[in-house]
């Protein structure tokens, strides 16, 4: 897509949200009870994600990267601290309100695609739109267009078991982006792929989020892939440290 279209999309998002952070966390603490002891995984994490920004979070295994992503996405609640999504008090909302805002404003991609095996690629991608209440014809039309954008326009009737690993992850990316979310949270999205396929999938994610003006937070062990983002943050000892 052209630079002009990219700029138009980011301008649209900026007009909608202004200078408000798409996603912001302040003082996040997350503690778990383990072996009779409290283990603090997050110890006062602050993070701000701007419109269209691409941020990588790196760190050792077990450092709490996935936990942080789950808290940012409203899939887990912090022990203390708060998260704002599009300027709204995400953590203070009721579960129903959180679910509604999450479905509208966030997309998720995981290491394992979590596609529904009994549904076709088209039905998997259309699912978030159906949950949002869009009519069936429009949901399928939008899903078809998004699958075409990820290079799977001829594979829409295939079920996940009939697709390669890279193709399944492309379907997962299409599902994450089909509702034009403000931000995509990705947890090791290329961790289950070979190096060549991982590079292709990561490039696709970056290109789509650029052209759609979508913000992007990725947890990854791959420093080379992280280096393609605008910023790299390292989670160490429960705190985020900016590396670049």
UniProtKB/Swiss-Prot annotation:
Keywords (A to Z) from UniProt: ATP-binding, Cell inner membrane, Cell membrane, Membrane, Nucleotide-binding, Translocase, Transport
Any GO molecular function: ATP binding
Record's keyword annotation contains Metal-binding: no
Keyword Nucleotide-binding tagged: yes
Gene Ontology cellular-component terms listed: plasma membrane
Pfam families to which the protein is assigned, alphabetical: ABC_tran
Residue numbers binding ATP: 59-66
UniProt enzyme class: translocase
Domain ABC transporter: residue ranges: 23-244
UniProt membrane topology term: Peripheral membrane protein
Biological processes per GO annotation: lipoprotein localization to outer membrane; protein localization to outer membrane
Subcellular location: Cell inner membrane
Enzyme Commission no: 7.6.2.-
Biological role: Part of the ABC transporter complex LolCDE involved in the translocation of mature outer membrane-directed lipoproteins, from the inner membrane to the periplasmic chaperone, LolA. Responsible for the formation of the LolA-lipoprotein complex in an ATP-dependent manner.
Family: Belongs to the ABC transporter superfamily. Lipoprotein translocase (TC 3.A.1.125) family.
Quaternary state and interactors: The complex is composed of two ATP-binding proteins (LolD) and two transmembrane proteins (LolC and LolE).
Protein name, entry field: Lipoprotein-releasing system ATP-binding protein LolD
Species, as recorded: Ralstonia nicotianae (strain ATCC BAA-1114 / GMI1000) (Ralstonia solanacearum)
